[in-house]
Amino acid sequence: MKLSKSTLIATLALTATSTNALVVQNPFSNIQQALKLDLSYDKLTSKLTDTFEQGKANIISTIAKVMNEPLDGLTPEIKNIWSEMLMKFPNSITELNFKAPPKKGKITTQQFDFHVTDAQVPNHKLRIKSTPKDLGIDTVKQYSGYLDVVDEDKHFFYYFFESRNDPKNDPVILWLNGGPGCSSLTGLFFELGPSSIDKNLKPVYNPHSWNANASVIFLDQPINVGYSYSSQSVSNTIAAGKDVYAFLQLFFKNFPEYANLDFHIAGESYAGHYIPAFASEILTHPERNFNLTSVLIGNGLTDPLVQYEYYEPMACGEGGEPSVLEPEECDGMLNSLPRCLSLIESCYESGSVWSCVPATIYCNNGQMGPYQKTGRNVYDIRTMCEGSSLCYSQLEYIDQYLNLPEVKKALGAEVDEYQSCNFDINRNFMFAGDWMKPYQKNVIDLLEKELPVLIYAGDKDFICNWLGNQAWTNRLEWSGSKGFTKAPVKSWKVGKNAAGEVKNYKHFTFLRVFGGGHMVPYDQPENALDMVNRWISGDYKY
């Protein structure tokens, strides 16, 4: 990817971000070469010319207007970071688009079987289509369609599969992929759904699908992700949560046979942001017509301040795999870590984009960049990145399949083109400062309300690695934290085989999955199914 000056920060965001969970497109070394940023900032003041100093305040003020963010509270360190960028290209930084252009779907003459509204979520409508079984994805009852937010022109696509076992009694799971900006249909066809897609673009039955003992909903959110579309834009997790609540309220109104069943929210990667926020939003609605029972987060990004400490240990031989970096590269990561953590702390304290955006840029460059230069898969430390689609060539088959006219017609899809990840959304969230915010606070809220929480992590993932996830769960300050800290780590077995390690106290569980990468159901399908089946049955101790 070539970097123009006018797309500098946008490219930083894209490079710093997402697949199914966090997306990282290109090596960070390219960014630093393009920017030639002095990340130490030690000699910044001496570099700035008098002429530049005169114009700098005006440029920063212009950016503040574009970002709709006041200048109050900027620390000297944060000012220095922005000044470093402005020094390199003072005449062109204001050309940046801090909000990506929305993706507008092509409205077609798709026919839907039902239209559902509810006074509790005004201005929302649910369209439902019975999906033909001869599409070959599964033989169970299945529905697809859209949640429409009429006045705001927002349209969220979903795909529902009934349980293969006992749909009248089995629980319901909502699955969310991350990114931010990646379609949950990736989870469907690549990880845990009823079928995968082969190179001939044909469905292949998955015996380890999570709908073995649960009905599963796959939701494309936020807007402009996957088959979802809008003329609007969204750039933060909290705003997305309100739309997800409206979707669930309407879905369970139309399908009251599922409303009284246990309901779980599961997801991975950036869903470490989504799920705590969405569950917290749901719990503020006592009038809801469904039964939120638990949440499951796999290889998530939830507490960046803790998790960013563990990129160097994971890359440098302390996570269970040999080091993939040279000693001097590991030293470089450690040297940049104190400033990284300081920037994240500023983001936690202020919540301002002025603090949170530089924290993302600096930390991703310093803590992920050296690993990315190796060409290794950020989602599986054991392998090299292959293919053009987020290190897994098979993902290209899914994109091709979901763009087949007959598939789009069968599902009622209303977009010109399906894309597994929308990197404009990724950039929007980054520029809103969402990446580095502390969503572990929402997890505390859930635990105090006695909602069961499972944090699971494949131990071969780099980008949201198990060391960081283990660390933030151990440091989480909630009423049961002392009990959780003292709880023993036990072996988790599937049959007679060791599948991982588990730590539990009351309704909070951390599970390390042996041999799993970022996408545990892809790498360990049988063990992942055992994990979810035991959890939804109420076995929180494993």
UniProtKB/Swiss-Prot annotation:
Give the matching InterPro entries: AB_hydrolase_fold, Peptidase_S10, Propeptide_carboxypepY, Ser_caboxypep_his_AS, Ser_caboxypep_ser_AS
Per the record, the GO terms for biological process are:
cellular response to nitrogen starvation; macroautophagy; phytochelatin biosynthetic process; zymogen activation
Q: Report the locations given in the UniProt record.
A: Vacuole
The UniProt entry, under PROSITE patterns, shows:
CARBOXYPEPT_SER_HIS (PS00560), CARBOXYPEPT_SER_SER (PS00131)
Gene3D superfamilies hit by this protein: 1.10.287.410, alpha/beta hydrolase
Active site residues per record: S269, D461, H518
The Gene Ontology terms for molecular function here are: serine-type carboxypeptidase activity
Catalysis performed (reactions) = Release of a C-terminal amino acid with broad specificity
What switches on expression, per the entry, is described as: Transiently down-regulated during the early events of yeast to hyphae conversion.
Annotated substrate binding lies at C464, M519
EC number(s) of the enzyme?
Answer: 3.4.16.5
Which superkingdom does the taxonomy of this entry point to? Eukaryota
Disulphide bridges, residue numbers:
C182-C421, C316-C330, C340-C363, C347-C356, C385-C391
Q: Which top EC class is named for this enzyme in its record?
A: hydrolase
Query: Which residue positions does the secretion signal occupy?
Result: 1-21
Keyword match Repeat: no
Instruction: Give the glycosylated residues.
Output: N213, N291
Q: Which GO terms describe its cellular component?
A: extracellular region; fungal-type vacuole lumen
Q: Which residues form the propeptide?
A: 22-127
Q: Which UniProt keywords apply?
A: Carboxypeptidase, Disulfide bond, Glycoprotein, Hydrolase, Protease, Signal, Vacuole, Zymogen
Query: Does Hydrolase appear among the keywords?
Result: yes
Q: Which family, according to UniProt?
A: Belongs to the peptidase S10 family.
Q: What does this protein do?
A: Involved in degradation of small peptides.
What is the protein named? Carboxypeptidase Y
What organism does this protein naturally occur in?
Candida albicans (Yeast)
